[in-house]
C-alpha cells in the first residue's frame, strides 16, 4: 500500500491544540496515558484470545516496554497487545474520542463485561503524546494478521496524518515520540522510572525498561550508565488492593501506606474492602497516626488516590470523601467510574455519590471501632483529628448522629479524661433536662469562666469546648439522643427543677430591687451592652457577659474577625451579681462622677474573664489607675 495522507476529522486540529496546551496541567501524565492504552490493548488481546488462543502467536506473556534513544531524541512505548489494522489505525488515531475499547465494550453483553478488564472511557489519551513530542510515529500489527500487513501512522499534530503499510513481525503497537527540544529530560531512565512508579506502579502487566549498569570509563574518560542488553521490570505489576486480604500482612499494608502517603509512621487504622453491586470498587483506606502540618487548610489536596482498573488517575480525589475526612489516605479503584475528558476532575454522577457514601461510612466505622475497642488508639486519633471531625456536623447531615457519638470534650468535673455526650447523659442529675456546655478560646478560659459558678455550686457537669470549630459546629447540633444542648453563656440561666424556689425568688427580688442601678448601668454602657440584668448564675464573680439564644457568641465573633470575615455587630448582655461587694460599691457610687468609669471597668473585666479584649485597652488601664489612686 502506498502512503496515504489523510485529514483528521473536523475540529480535530483545534482539539489537538487544546490537548497539548490546555488539557493537562502536568506534562508527565503523557506516559501514564500511553502506558494505560498499552495495558488496554493487552487486556483486549487476553479477552479475544479466550475464543482464539492462536492470537497469542506463541507469545502469551503480555508486557509493556519503555525505551529511549538519546541520539535520535525518541521515546518509545511498545506493547504486545491486540495491535491495530490499517483501518483501525485510521479510525482510532484519526478521531479524537474515538475509543476502540469503548466500541469494544459496547459489543459485549452479560457476564462478558465482567471479564473484560478495560478502561475504555478516555478518548484523548493517545494525543497527550503531543505535549512532549512534535511528531508521533505509530507502528502496529493486529494479532492474527500477517507480518506484511503492519501499519505505520505518522503525524505532527497538525491537520493531517500519513498512513502506510509496513513489515512488522511482532504483534502489538509501538508509539515513537519524537521529542521537542524542551522535553529532552525525558531521555533519562531515572526520570522515566520515577514517572512509572508514581502513575503506573500498580498496572497488572510488567512494565519493562532496558537495564543499566555503571560502566567505568577508559583512557581517563569518565564513567557512565550503560545498557546491558537486558530488560528489567520497573513496576510492582500487582496492585496490593486487588490481592486477597488473607494474603496481605499488616507489614504489607504499612509499607504501602508509607509509599502513598510519604509518612514515616505506620497508620493508626486500616480498612480494605471490595464493594460489589450497581457500583463496583475497591477501597483501601488509612487513618494516619499524626496530623499533617496543613490539616486545618480546608483547601488542601485530599489524601485519597483514584485508580480506574489499577491505572492512577489523580492524587486528590476530593469528590470521594467529604472535606472533614481530608486526613484519610488511601486508594479507591473503580471498575466503572465515569471521568471527564481529561481525567483531572471527577464528574458528578450516581457512581461518584455511591463511592463517596460508601467510603464515608467505612471511615466512620473505622473510627467507631477505635472508640469501642481500642481506647488508647482512639485517644491518639482524637487528639490529632478530633477538631476536623467536628466539621462534619455542619457538612454531613446523613451521618450527624454517628459523628455526635464520636465527639469527646473536656469536663468541669474531671481534669484527666474527656467525655462523650453519652457519658454526660449517663450521669445527669435527676431533674436535669439539658446537656450544658461552654465554648472559650482556651481550655483554661473555659474552666475559669464565671458562667460556671452556679453549676459548680450545684455539682452540675458542664462540657468545656475550646476548639475553634466548636461554636460553629454546635450550631448544627441542637440535641443529642433527645436531650437538648444548652450553652451556659447564652440566654437566661434556667436550671429548672435543679434551682430551688428560694433561689428563684431571690433572683426576681434582686431584679426589682436593683432596677435603678441596672437602668443607670444600661445608660452608661449603651454603646457596649444590649442589656444589663441581675443574675443568679454568678457566685464569686461580680459580672459576666452572655448573649441571647440564637445570637453569635462573642467568642465566635472574635474568631471570625481574626479570620478576616465580616461579622454583624452583636452587643452582649451584662449580667451582674447583686450580692457581690464590687456591685454593692457601684450601687453606692451611683451619684458620683466616677460611676461611668466604674461601669466600664465592670464590663471590661467581664470581657477579659471570657478571653476577650477591651475595645480601648488604654482607656481601660486609665480607668483602673484612677480607681487605684
From Swiss-Prot:
GO terms for molecular function: ATP binding; ATP hydrolysis activity; ATP-dependent protein folding chaperone; unfolded protein binding. It comes from the Bacteria. It is found in: Cytoplasm. Residues 344-558 are annotated as: B. SMART domains: HATPase_c. Keywords: ATP-binding, Chaperone, Cytoplasm, Nucleotide-binding, Stress response. Residues 1-343 are annotated as: A. GO terms for cellular component: cytoplasm. Coiled coil: none annotated. Residues 559-629 are annotated as: C. Signal peptide: none annotated. Homodimer. NCBIfam families: PRK05218.1. PANTHER family: HEAT SHOCK PROTEIN 90 FAMILY MEMBER (PTHR11528). Molecular chaperone. Has ATPase activity. Belongs to the heat shock protein 90 family. This is Chaperone protein HtpG.
Amino acid at each position: 500500500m502506498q502512503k496515504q495522507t489523510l485529514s483528521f476529522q473536523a475540529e480535530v486540529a483545534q482539539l489537538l491544540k487544546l490537548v497539548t496546551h490546555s488539557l493537562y496541567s502536568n506534562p508527565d501524565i503523557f506516559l501514564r496515558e500511553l502506558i494505560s492504552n498499552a495495558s488496554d490493548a493487552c487486556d483486549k488481546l487476553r479477552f479475544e484470545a479466550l475464543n482464539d488462543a492462536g492470537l497469542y502467536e506463541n507469545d502469551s506473556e503480555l508486557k509493556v516496554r519503555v525505551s529511549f534513544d538519546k541520539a535520535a531524541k525518541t521515546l518509545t512505548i511498545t506493547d504486545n497487545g491486540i495491535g491495530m489494522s490499517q483501518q483501525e489505525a485510521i479510525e482510532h488515531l484519526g478521531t479524537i474520542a474515538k475509543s476502540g475499547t469503548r466500541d469494544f465494550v459496547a459489543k459485549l453483553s452479560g457476564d462478558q463485561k465482567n471479564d473484560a478488564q478495560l478502561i475504555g472511557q478516555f478518548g484523548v489519551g493517545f494525543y497527550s503524546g503531543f505535549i512532549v513530542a512534535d511528531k508521533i510515529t505509530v507502528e502496529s500489527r493486529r494479532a492474527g494478521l500477517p507480518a506484511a500487513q503492519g501499519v505505520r501512522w505518522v503525524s505532527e499534530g497538525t491537520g493531517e496524518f500519513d498512513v502506510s503499510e509496513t513489515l512488522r513481525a511482532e504483534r502489538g503497537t509501538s508509539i515513537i515520540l519524537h521529542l521537542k527540544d524542551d522535553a529532552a529530560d525525558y531521555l533519562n531512565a531515572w526520570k522515566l522510572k520515577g514517572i512509572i512508579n508514581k502513575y503506573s506502579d500498580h498496572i497488572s502487566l510488567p512494565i519493562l525498561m532496558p537495564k543499566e549498569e555503571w560502566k567505568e570509563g577508559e583512557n581517563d574518560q569518565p564513567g557512565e550508565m550503560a545498557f546491558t542488553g537486558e530488560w528489567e521490570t520497573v513496576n510492582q505489576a500487582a496492585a496490593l488492593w486487588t490481592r486477597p486480604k488473607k494474603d496481605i500482612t499488616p507489614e504489607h499494608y504499612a509499607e504501602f501506606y508509607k509509599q502513598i502517603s510519604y509518612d514515616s509512621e505506620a497508620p493508626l487504622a486500616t480498612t480494605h474492602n471490595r464493594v460489589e453491586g450497581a457500583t463496583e470498587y475497591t477501597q483501601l483506606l488509612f487513618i494516619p497516626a499524626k496530623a499533617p502540618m496543613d490539616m486545618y487548610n480546608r483547601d488542601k489536596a485530599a489524601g485519597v488516590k483514584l485508580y480506574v482498573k489499577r491505572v492512577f488517575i489523580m492524587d486528590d480525589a476530593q469528590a470521594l470523601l467529604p472535606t472533614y475526612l481530608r486526613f484519610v489516605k488511601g486508594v479507591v479503584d473503580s471498575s466503572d467510574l465515569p471521568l471527564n475528558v481529561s481525567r483531572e476532575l471527577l464528574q458528578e454522577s450516581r457512581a461518584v455519590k455511591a463511592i463517596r457514601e460508601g467510603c464515608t461510612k467505612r471511615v466512620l466505622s473505622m473510627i467507631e471501632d477505635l472508640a469501642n475497642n481500642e481506647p488508647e488508639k482512639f485517644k491518639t486519633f482524637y487528639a490529632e483529628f478530633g477538631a476536623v471531625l467536628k466539621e462534619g456536623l455542619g457538612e454531613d447531615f446523613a451521618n450527624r448522629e454517628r459523628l455526635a457519638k464520636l465527639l469527646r470534650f473536656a469536663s468541669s468535673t474531671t481534669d484527666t479524661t474527656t467525655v462523650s455526650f453519652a457519658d454526660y447523659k449517663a450521669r445527669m442529675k435527676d431533674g436535669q433536662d439539658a446537656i450544658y456546655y461552654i465554648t472559650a478560646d482556651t481550655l483554661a478560659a473555659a474552666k475559669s469562666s464565671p458562667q460556671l459558678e452556679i453549676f459548680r455550686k450545684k455539682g452540675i457537669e458542664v462540657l468545656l469546648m475550646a476548639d475553634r470549630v466548636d461554636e460553629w459546629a454546635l450550631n448544627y447540633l441542637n440535641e443529642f439522643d433527645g436531650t437538648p444542648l444548652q450553652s451556659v453563656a447564652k440566654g437566661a440561666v434556667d436550671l429548672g427543677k435543679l434551682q430551688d424556689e428560694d433561689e428563684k425568688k431571690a433572683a426576681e427580688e434582686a431584679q426589682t430591687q436593683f432596677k435603678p442601678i441596672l437602668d443607670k448601668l444600661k445608660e452608661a454602657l449603651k454603646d457596649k451592652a444590649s442589656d444589663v440584668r441581675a443574675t443568679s448564675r454568678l457566685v464569686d464573680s461580680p459580672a459576666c457577659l452572655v448573649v441571647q439564644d440564637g445570637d453569635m457568641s462573642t467568642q465566635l465573633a472574635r474568631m471570625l474577625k481574626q479570620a478576616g470575615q465580616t461579622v454583624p455587630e452583636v452587643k452582649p448582655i451584662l449580667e451582674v451579681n447583686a450580692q457581690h461587694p464590687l456591685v454593692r460599691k457601684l450601687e453606692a457610687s451611683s451619684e458620683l462622677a466616677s460611676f461611668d468609669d466604674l461601669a466600664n471597668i465592670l464590663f471590661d473585666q467581664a470581657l477579659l474573664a471570657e478571653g476577650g479584649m477591651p475595645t480601648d485597652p488604654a482607656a481601660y488601664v486609665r480607668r483602673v489607675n484612677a480607681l487605684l489612686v
